[in-house]
Amino acid sequence: MIKIGVIIGTTRPTRKGPLVANWLMEKINKLDIKNTEFVLLDIQKEDLPFLMDPKSPADGDYELASTKKWSKKIDELDGFIFITAEYNNGPAAPLKNAIDTIYREWDRKPVAFVGYGTYGATRAVEQLVDITAKIGMAPLSKTFVGISKFWDAVDEDGNIKEEYVNGNVEKLVDNLLWWAKALKDKK
């Protein structure tokens, strides 16, 4: 069984990450994938204070209960989809904090990206590709899905209009699962 974490990377009260996550999960559920579980993680609901654990995350010797809880959740997963907005040409600080709070739990795991914003969060994703590669993850930018002109991309009922979606969710998931299986088998 492959377990994929779908992480909503924003925490603002007016954020649209949950809307994008629901859209993504609906698309994934239609794919009818066997032997795979997709786990939705919303960092707004996680207790992740900004780098408050007194020791370096590289050691994995966490003191805070919140860090231990986050570590366990991430450690149990085989790959990730980061859902990110773009704030001032980069990813939201809470997502970066969620990455930086722990370390070894991300190692040798693939990560795909779904971005939303004026330009589909391309600049935020570019930075996340670099960040995740530096901590030993396998970033999969080739199958990135971006939702551009986001304020126009959502209709009055809160649905995402497909004409604003760049990329293909099925290809993203297929690529992510290939890497998750390959890397899990090598651990």
Where are the predicted features?
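Short, histidine-centered active-site or binding-site loop motifs used for metal coordination
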Residues: 8-10, 115, 151
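N-terminal beta1-alpha1-beta2 submodule of the flavodoxin-like/Rossmannoid cofactor-binding fold
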Residues: 1-84, 90-97, 101, 156-187
